Each structure stands twice: as structure tokens, then as C-alpha cells.
Curated annotation (Swiss-Prot):
Positions contributing to Zn(2+) binding: C401, C404, C417, C422
Reaction it catalyzes: NAD(+) + (deoxyribonucleotide)n-3'-hydroxyl + 5'-phospho-(deoxyribonucleotide)m = (deoxyribonucleotide)n+m + AMP + beta-nicotinamide D-nucleotide
BRCT domain sequence ranges: 589-669
Residues that bind NAD(+): D33, V34, T35, Y36, D37, S82, L83, E115, R138, E172, K286, K310
Single GO term (MF): metal ion binding
Superkingdom in the source lineage: Bacteria
Similarity section: Belongs to the NAD-dependent DNA ligase family. LigA subfamily.
Record-linked InterPro entries: BRCT_dom, BRCT_dom_sf, DNA_ligase, DNAligase_adenylation, DNAligase_N, NA-bd_OB-fold, NAD_DNA_ligase_OB, RuvA_2-like
Cofactor(s) the record lists: Mg(2+); Mn(2+)
Lineage of the organism: Bacteria, Pseudomonadati, Spirochaetota, Spirochaetia, Spirochaetales
Protein name according to UniProt: DNA ligase
Matches recorded under Pfam families: BRCT, DNA_ligase_aden, DNA_ligase_OB
Length: 669
């Protein structure tokens, strides 16, 4: 009996996977909807009755689940970088010529892959032994949220690829223009564009709801593969074989007239832009040969072997209804134009930043004027010019703060409120503190913070940890369940890493990259930084010794750690048990041979996957470089090394094996 049930389940599963491929990949279905639905319902019934036979690659997972997702934050195995950008064809042509020259000098025949840049939500798919193991959002490039339960519901995401291989893939999840307009019309809270709607659907906590939305995906890049793949177009052939959906407008270019042919392709895609059923905002070019990519390497921001050509922003005409003045957490004053609602590139626009008084004067703008509106980079609304002047004179920003009424000061082209008690500045600090990039207090939206602040329930970040949130129960929008969720989120925030707390303090010029520089130079705790800053002169010398920290940043760090208000906040959080030091796993070890050494890797290793080995070495204080340059301290060489070894030898860089490294330092402690 058991064997018969298991055999039927396996047979149904194989049949449904075959039909899925015929329908979604080959576009040639061999069975009708009734047959398909009947088989899927039978499989679902059997798996529910015999759960011991259910597997992670079952097609029934496409139905979703009623279990609530918690979207845990997970570290990416590889940094998820941005792309270099070009905004005109001359810039793009220069990049193509540069890649061709570098490829030729290294003995490569240049080939370039091109494809439309989808304006959706980036996702990273991890396959282990051929089965989808996790699906991470891009997040901050280092950490993303695992939304696998929701991604499993997307029909064009294979749950199993039929071979026991490991893959890490990048893709773009999207919703078509037609579906966006149809769905958005039915929602209580509508979305500004298709990308935001896609993101909202992807983050729904109940995957049974997600299955009802027509999300789709294009896979466009391989970050890691256990297969031997040498080129992008070979990789795409393999991905198509596995059942992944690839953009049909992808094209490969090589040979004579390379630059001219690519520019013609880009212009053709841009001309057809409005005919695409989904939003696109440019074209992405990638060097086709993976070995050449390996040599070209990366910056901290983007791969050198790829570039995105951004289309010129679409424009529309609207009328300025009003101009309001906003105050940021730094006190910066920003004028904003409220305009009559207009649709641009799939998004409804109702406001646009005017930057400063100089910008307003340069375009001669005032209330009632008719203006041309764009979305720069298809993201940021901008007033480009006055089409019809219906007012007299230009709008003038008041010389006092709209929040606290104190006089403003001018720094460069911008006006600032320097009153530390300014309500809007304080509220901006609280919003920043709670934001996802900082303490990530789920449930404390900007609207909720504004309500709590305006009701005098909170007046600083500290109040979030002293206020009795039970007082909110019974108020409009605050039931017992929501209040408990808020309390739980606030409590969980106490466990954030020290670097997040340091970022959340909003210290001028102290962004995450500077914080990581401090941590990697033994300034990895509140006590270490505050102790150093007690001696201003010594602190300045020490900070300026850190590559990447200049005088302005150093002075702002010293000033902040001598500010009583900031120190009192740190001490308050310390008293609540917040982490005031980076966990040892993230901190460098000063005594290690590897501390401060810049290294690169080529070849493969039996003992560790490359990304694991890189992680182990960087935790000893070394700095990983993705490409070989004269600044490298050593190249770690494994089996079947690539062209990096030749380049390192030419530059006289020290060559080490894994055996050499392990003789010098214990990687596993």
C-alpha cells in the first residue's frame, strides 16, 4: 500500500513538472487545464494525507501556505553589488571600447551579452543539490530577507532543476503593466508603481495570499555554479534547459562593428520601451567570457565587466499646486513642489523635490506654473523646466524653520535649521533610528512614529524603550495584537549588532562603510571609540591613519563622542543590554598573520568552497580583493588557477597555497 501511494505521488509529481515546463518554458502545452488541475489536486490530497512523502521540490508548494513567514535576515554568500551606469550612448561606446581593448590585451575574443533592464524586485535564488533552498532579497547587498515561501509560489521559479548541482542565481521579479493597473485599482492602499506593488506582494506574511498574484521572474545572472561554465550565453543555454525563464530580448554580440551593433540594439529597445508588457528602465551589457570577468574583477560598488545604460527619463506636463518646505533629520531644508497627479513610466507622481533656492531660481518656478516632470533614472521625480509661466516671480524659501520658527543658516547651496530641539529634526532622527537599515523595528512605520510623536507619547529614541505601549490599546488602529507585535519588535531591536546601533545614532558622516573601517581597525566597541576620543589630538592621528577616513569624518566622529547628548544615549542603551561591541565573529584578530593583508583567490579548493574560504580569511582581518593589482599582499592559489596567477607573477605578488596559510594561522578557530 505504502509503495503504491509513494509511486503515485512520484508519478504525479513528474507529470506536473513536465507539464509546467511545456507550458511556461516551451510554450507548447500537451494537456488541458482540467487534466492539469485534477492531477495537482490529487497530488495535494495525497501529500496532505501522507506528509512523509512530501518534498521541498513538490509542485504543490506553488499553492503557498497558511503558515506566517518571519522573513529572517540572512547573509548573502556573495556580495550583491550594484551596476555601473551610463546615461548616453557615447559613454556606453567608451565602455565597450575599453572592454574590447582590455580583452584583446589579455588574449580574449571580445563578446558582450545585452538584455533589457527589468524594473522589478531583485532576488537571489540558492539551489543546493538541485533543489531551491532559499530566496533572498537584495537587502543592503550583504544581508537580505529570506522570502522563499512566497517565491515558491511563482510558477516560473523551478523548485527542482533535475540535476544535483549548486547554483546561486540573480533574477528580477516583476508584475506586468496590465496586471499592475488591474490589481492596484482593487486595493485599499494603492501603490505608486508596479515595482512597489511587486515588493509589497513579495513581503506578504501569508504565502497562500501571494499565490493569487501574477508575479513573474526573469533570471539574468549566475553568481556561483558547481558546473563548468565559461560564457554567459553558454550559461543561459544551461539555465533554459533547467527550466528558468530568460528574457527573450537577450542578445549576444561579437566580431566586427561590435560597438555600432550594440548601440543599434540599445536604441531599438529604447524605441520599443512602451510596447513591453513590463517596465524596463535601460539595457544591461555584460562581458560574455567568465574567465575575462574574473580578471577584470570588481570595485566595492559594481563589477567592472558590466554596465547599465539608463534610458532618458520619460516626461509629462503638470501644474504646481503648492510648494512646501520640509526639514530633514540633519536640519537640511528642502522645498518640495506638490503637483497635479500625473502618470510617468508606470508611476503616479504628486510631488517632486526642488532641492534648494538656487535650483528654483535657475528654472524660474513658483506656484501655479505649468512644468515638465520626469523620473530621473525612472525613480526620482524631478521638475525639469517651466513650460508655461502663470505666476509672478520665483518662490522664496522663508529664512526661518517651518517647524521651530528659528532662523536658518546657509551652508553652501542649502539652508539648515541648527536648533537641536527642532521637533521635525527630532522626529526625523526617530524615524531613521527605527528604519530597516538601522534598528529595523518592524511595525513602527513613519506614520506610526508621527502619531506617537504628535501625541507626545515619545520625544526621542530613548522613549521607545520606556513608553508603556499598552496605553495605545483601544485607540484607533491599535488593537491588542498590533500593540504586542510592536512591543516584541522593540524588544528584539536590543539584539541588533553594535554596528547597527552606531549607524542608528545618525552621527554626521558616519555611514556603514566608515563604521566597518572603524571595526576593522580595532575600534569595534563603544568603549574603544569613546576612550580614544577623550584625547582629541591622539584620536585625530589614529583616525587619519585609517585609509578611507579624512579630516572631516575624523572631526565629526571626535565631536560626536564628546557630545553629552549622544554619550547619554549610548549609556542608556548600554544599561538596557544593547550590544556595545561587534560580535567576535565579525571582528578582526590583531595578532593574526593575516591582519590587514589584501588578498585575492584563484582556482578551486577541495576543503572549502571559495566563498567559505574568503569568509574565514576575512574574519582573521584580511581584506578580500576580487581582482589582482599591485596593491595585493598575496594571491591564494588553488587547483586549476586562472589568468590571475599569470598577472600576479608579472607583478611580483607573493603566491600562497592553502597549505601555506594553514601553517601560519588556524582558519577554523
Amino acid at each position: 500500500m505504502g509503495k503504491d501511494i509513494k509511486d503515485e505521488i512520484l508519478s504525479l509529481r513528474d507529470a506536473i513538472k513536465k507539464w509546467d515546463r511545456e507550458y511556461y518554458v516551451d510554450s507548447s502545452p500537451t494537456v488541458g487545464d482540467v487534466t492539469y488541475d485534477k492531477a495537482l489536486l490529487r497530488l495535494q490530497y495525497l501529500e496532505n494525507r501522507y506528509p512523509e512523502y512530501k518534498t521541498l521540490d513538490s509542485p504543490t508548494l506553488k499553492f503557498g501556505s497558511d503558515l506566517l513567514n518571519d522573513f529572517k535576515e540572512v547573509e548573502h554568500s556573495y556580495p550583491i553589488l550594484s551596476l555601473d551606469k551610463a546615461y548616453d550612448v557615447k559613454e556606453l561606446l567608451l565602455w565597450v571600447e575599453k572592454m574590447s581593448l582590455e580583452g584583446s590585451n589579455l588574449g580574449f575574443d571580445m563578446g558582450i551579452s545585452a538584455e533589457p533592464k527589468i524594473d522589478g524586485c531583485s532576488i537571489v535564488l540558492y539551489y543546493k543539490d538541485g533543489i531551491l533552498e532559499k530566496a533572498l532579497t537584495r537587502g543592503d547587498g550583504r544581508f537580505g530577507n529570506n522570502v522563499i515561501e512566497n517565491v515558491r509560489t511563482i510558477k516560473n521559479v523551478p523548485l527542482c532543476i533535475g540535476e544535483r548541482v549548486e547554483l546561486v542565481l540573480r533574477g528580477e521579479i516583476y508584475i506586468t503593466k496590465k496586471d499592475f493597473l488591474k490589481i492596484n485599482h482593487t486595493l485599499d492602499d494603492s501603490y505608486i508603481n508596479a515595482r512597489n506593488l511587486t515588493s509589497g506582494i513579495l513581503r506578504r506574511i501569508n504565502s497562500r495570499e501571494v499565490v493569487n498574484f501574477p508575479l513573474d521572474i526573469f533570471v539574468y545572472d549566475i553568481l556561483y555554479s558547481s558546473l563548468e561554465l565559461n560564457t554567459n550565453h553558454d550559461a543561459f543555454d544551461k539555465l533554459k534547459h533547467f527550466g528558468f525563464k530568460l528574457n527573450p530580448f537577450c542578445k549576444f554580440f561579437c566580431g566586427k562593428n561590435l560597438g555600432e551593433n550594440i548601440i543599434n540594439y540599445v536604441k531599438e529597445i529604447e524605441e520599443q520601451r512602451e510596447r513591453f508588457e513590463y517596465e524596463i528602465d535601460g539595457v544591461v551589457l555584460k562581458v560574455d567570457d567568465f574567465r575575462l570577468r574574473d580578471v577584470l574583477g570588481y570595485t566595492s560598488h559594481h563589477p567592472k565587466w558590466s554596465i547599465a545604460y539608463k534610458f532618458e527619463s520619460l516626461r509629462a506636463v503638470s501644474k504646481v499646486i503648492d510648494i512646501v518646505v520640509q526639514v530633514g533629520r540633519s536640519g537640511k531644508i528642502t522645498p518640495v513642489a506638490n503637483i497635479e497627479k500625473v502618470l510617468i513610466a508606470g508611476a503616479f507622481i504628486t510631488s517632486a523635490s526642488l532641492h534648494n533656492q538656487d535650483y528654483i531660481d535657475s528654472i524660474g518656478l513658483n506656484v501655479k506654473d505649468v512644468v515638465a516632470i520626469s523620473r530621473r533614472g525612472d525613480v526620482i521625480p524631478a521638475v525639469e523646466l517651466v513650460v508655461e509661466k502663470l505666476s509672478v516671480g520665483n518662490f522664496k524659501i522663508p529664512n526661518y524653520c517651518p517647524s521651530c520658527k528659528k532662523s536658518l543658516i546657509k551652508e553652501g547651496a542649502h539652508l539648515f535649521c541648527v536648533n537641536i530641539h527642532c521637533p521635525l529634526k527630532i522626529m526625523g532622527h526617530i524615524k531613521y533610528f527605527c528604519s530597516k537599515k538601522c534598528m529595523n523595528i518592524v511595525g513602527l512605520s513613519e506614520k506610526t512614529i508621527e502619531f506617537l510623536f504628535n501625541m507626545n507619547f515619545i520625544s526621542s529614541e530613548i522613549d521607545l524603550y520606556t513608553f508603556d505601549f499598552d496605553r495605545l490599546i483601544g485607540l484607533k488602529g491599535f488593537n491588542f495584537k498590533r500593540v504586542n507585535k510592536l512591543k516584541r519588535s522593540i524588544e528584539e531591536s536590543k539584539n541588533r549588532p553594535f554596528k547597527k546601533l552606531l549607524l542608528a545614532m545618525g552621527i554626521k558622516d558616519l555611514g556603514i562603510n566608515t563604521i566597518l573601517l572603524l571595526i576593522n581597525n580595532n575600534l569595534n566597541s563603544f568603549d574603544a571609540i569613546s576612550l580614544l576620543c577623550q584625547d582629541n589630538k591622539n584620536a585625530l592621528v589614529k583616525l587619519l591613519d585609517i585609509k578611507g577616513i579624512g579630516e572631516r569624518i575624523a572631526f565629526n566622529i571626535i565631536r560626536a563622542f564628546n557630545d553629552k547628548i549622544i554619550l547619554d544615549k549610548f549609556n542608556f542603551f548600554k544599561g538596557l543590554g544593547f550590544k556595545m561591541q561587534e560580535d567576535s565573529i565579525n571582528c578582526v584578530v590583531d595578532s593574526s598573520f593575516l591582519f590587514g593583508k589584501k588578498f585575492c583567490i584563484t582556482g578551486s579548493f577541495d576543503e572549502y568552497p571559495r566563498h567559505v574560504l574568503i569568509d574565514k580569511i576575512t574574519k582573521k582581518g584580511a581584506i578580500f580583493n576580487s581582482s589582482v593589482s599591485r596593491y595585493l599582499d598575496f594571491l591564494l592559489v588553488g587547483k586549476s588557477p586562472g589568468l590571475k596567477l599569470k598577472k600576479a607573477n608579472n607583478l611580483g605578488i607573493k603566491i600562497l597555497s592553502l597549505f601555506d596559510i594553514k601553517n601560519l594561522v588556524n582558519l577554523d578557530d
